[in-house]
Amino acid sequence: MALTHLQQLEAESIKIMREVAAEFENPVMLYSIGKDSSVLLHLARKAFYPAKIPFPLLHVDTNWKFSEMIEFRDRIAKEYGFELLVHKNPEGMEIGISPFEHGSGKHTDIMKTQGLKQALDKYGFDAAFGGARRDEEKSRAKERVYSFRDKHHRWDPKNQRPELWNTYNSQVNPGESIRVFPLSNWTELDIWQYIYQENIDMVPLYLAKERPVVDRDGTLIMVDDERMPLLEGEVPMMKSVRFRTLGCYPLTGAVESTASSLTEIIEEMLLSTSSEREGRVIDHDSAGSMEKKKREGYF
């Protein structure tokens, strides 16, 4: 019997995960707590069932994630029983890096990019799973499934290995590593249909709800805690919003929506003509912003 579209994607991702677990000495899964990470975690549990996942999950905590994301992370880790590593850049924490005071570019570089590189060096990981997909953004569209990184964790799009069909090159020298993207060929719609099919638990922020937001240059920013400074005369508005992508709350824009169930989200996706990452402030720091970040070691 022929496999469905989602079954083909699932089989491809599981094969990649098993291959990485067999070929690399010390792999890790980057866990950002979003919908793609939740699908990645579900696939990993399937890939190695009934055994436990044979590698840890790593969350690079910027100290500015939505509070619901952290609550979800801790609950899922406890329920599923996987090894969870949480890393915060100690230098960034010491000087109190903030997206409000220091700007999105500096905050992202210190707390995300440098924080990730610190964690990868600390534990000596030679392969790191990520949930990036090619349909998300143009620099990710040209990234390999096995994305080679040099000893400084930098990505050079001109220095990548050919990938013929489903054959991948896992050879690295000491200090080098591979970022592995099992969801490369999935789309945002595929992700939501798979979440619905498999009944995967996810952060409630993806569902529409009345939330306090402020309009900053056309981007709806949710007031998640008392650390967010309001501008003079600015008053949070209660709007029915949801998030298509999750990150640091001051840098993540909400979309007005009434989609409060998975079926409604899927219906919304079928009509959508915009990228989910339009709400990511960090993607608009400068032209080619995401590619520049990836060259420096970003996810």
Curated annotation (Swiss-Prot):
Enzymatic reactions: sulfate + ATP + H(+) = adenosine 5'-phosphosulfate + diphosphate
SUPFAM superfamilies in alphabetical order: Adenine nucleotide alpha hydrolases-like (SSF52402)
Biological pathway: Sulfur metabolism; hydrogen sulfide biosynthesis; sulfite from sulfate: step 1/3
Classification via Pfam families: PAPS_reduct
InterPro entries in UniProt: PAPS_reduct_dom (IPR002500), Rossmann-like_a/b/a_fold (IPR014729), SO4_adenylTrfase_ssu (IPR011784), Sulfate_adenylyltrnsfr_sub2 (IPR050128)
Protein purpose: With CysN forms the ATP sulfurylase (ATPS) that catalyzes the adenylation of sulfate producing adenosine 5'-phosphosulfate (APS) and diphosphate, the first enzymatic step in sulfur assimilation pathway. APS synthesis involves the formation of a high-energy phosphoric-sulfuric acid anhydride bond driven by GTP hydrolysis by CysN coupled to ATP hydrolysis by CysD.
Protein name: Sulfate adenylyltransferase subunit 2
Gene behind the chain: cysD
